C-alpha cells in the first residue's frame, strides 16, 4: 500500500505540480492508496468551510482509510524519536513519527512532500515513493 501524507494531499488540492503530486496523480490503481486517519484529520482541518471539508472528505473516502495509532505504534514511535534524536535528526511533529512508524510496521511505502521524512529515511528503513 502507498500511504499518502497530508503534505501531498494539500498540495494536490491547491493544484500544485510538485514531484510528489505528479506521482500521486500517476497512481493507476486507487485501491493501493491508503489514507491514515490522522492524515485525514490534517487535511480536513485546513478546509475553508464545512462544505469544503465535506467535499474533501467524500473524495478521500474513495480510498482505504485506516487508524494509524495504537499502543504499540505509540511505544515504537517514541523509540524512533529517541533513535533519531541521538543521530541529530530533529522531528518537528509527533504526527510525522506516527506516520513513519505506521509505514515501517506495516511495510507500506510513503508518498510525501515533507523534508522531515527525508531526514527520518536517512536513518530508518522508510520506503518512500
What positions do the PLM features span?
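Conserved beta-strand scaffold positions in the cores of enzyme catalytic domains, especially
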Residues: 65-66, 128
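A general structural signal for well-ordered alpha-helical segments in protein cores
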Residues: 21, 40, 53, 74-78, ...
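Acidic, PIN/NYN-like endoribonuclease modules and their adjacent C-terminal/linker elements
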Residues: 1, 104-129
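Histidine- and aromatic-rich ligand-binding microenvironments
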Residues: 5, 36, 92-93, 114
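A generic structural signal for short hydrophobic patches within well-formed alpha-helices
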Residues: 9-10, 40-43, 117
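Structured helix-beta-strand junction loops
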Residues: 29-31, 62-63, 87, 106, ...
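Active-site neighborhoods of divalent-metal-dependent phosphate/nucleic-acid chemistry enzymes
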Residues: 66-111
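Short, well-structured N-terminal submotif of metal-dependent ribonuclease cores
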Residues: 1-35, 45-58
Amino acid at each position: 500500500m502507498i500511504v499518502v501524507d497530508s503534505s501531498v494531499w494539500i498540495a494536490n488540492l491547491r493544484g500544485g505540480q510538485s514531484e510528489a503530486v505528479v506521482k500521486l496523480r500517476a497512481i493507476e490503481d486507487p485501491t493501493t492508496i491508503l489514507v491514515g486517519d490522522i492524515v485525514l484529520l490534517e487535511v480536513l482541518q485546513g478546509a475553508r468551510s464545512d462544505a469544503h471539508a465535506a467535499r474533501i472528505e467524500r473524495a478521500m473516502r474513495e480510498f482505504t482509510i485506516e487508524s494509524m495509532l495504537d499502543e504499540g505504534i505509540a511505544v515504537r514511535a517514541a523509540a524512533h524519536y529517541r533513535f533519531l534524536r541521538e543521530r541529530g535528526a530533529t522531528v518537528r511533529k509527533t504526527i510525522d513519527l506516527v506516520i513513519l512508524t505506521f509505514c515501517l510496521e506495516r511495510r507500506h511505502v510513503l508518498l510525501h512532500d515533507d523534508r522531515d521524512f527525508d531526514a527520518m529515511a536517512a536513518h530508518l528503513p522508510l520506503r518512500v515513493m
